[in-house]
Amino acid sequence: MSDPELIRALSDLTLAVRGGIPVTIVDPRREASIYYSGRGIITAAGTLVVWAVPAEKRFLLKGFIVTAVVTDTLAAASGEAGILYFLDDADSDRPVCPIGAFDDTAAIGTWFNRDVPDLGSGIRGSALGSNLKIAFYEDIGGGNIEVQWCVWGDEIP
């Protein structure tokens, strides 16, 4: 490429940048057909159903926001920290996505917020009618965790 060609190419590029470069952004929150929100409390070995899927469909999780707060001091039965996570109840409670963790003796008021990780094109349920749940990996011997959530995605065949 000669100097005049290079100068012309740089000039064309400068004009294109000044006018803006067309960019397509895909936001999973705008591509979803299902939005569910709710709240619940996890105690002992409990779970929370966050997305009850019809028998002839699967969930396709595209995004979520979760806030979790210890509302009564925890005492994990194992004495180890525990992970709050989404699970697929049709596949032996297969972990779908981690949400966050609490120490085994987290005090009242301990909290975290998990905001919209990149799930790519989504995480699909393993079977028709599989529900999406939230659980705490360790059994809770005492205390509880209040969880508030919003999940979105699609229900697919």
Question: What residue spans do the PLM features occupy?
Answer:
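Extended low-polarity, hydrophobic cluster-rich segments
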Residues: 10-13, 62, 97
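Short, surface-exposed beta-strand/strand-loop-strand elements in extracellular ectodomains
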Residues: 72-97
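C-terminal interaction-tip segments
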Residues: 3, 7, 26-56, 71-76, ...
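Solvent-exposed serine/threonine-rich low-complexity stretches and specific carbohydrate-binding patches
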Residues: 37-40, 95-107
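Beta-sandwich interaction modules
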Residues: 107-129
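Extended extracellular/luminal ectodomain segments enriched in beta-structured repeat modules
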Residues: 55-63
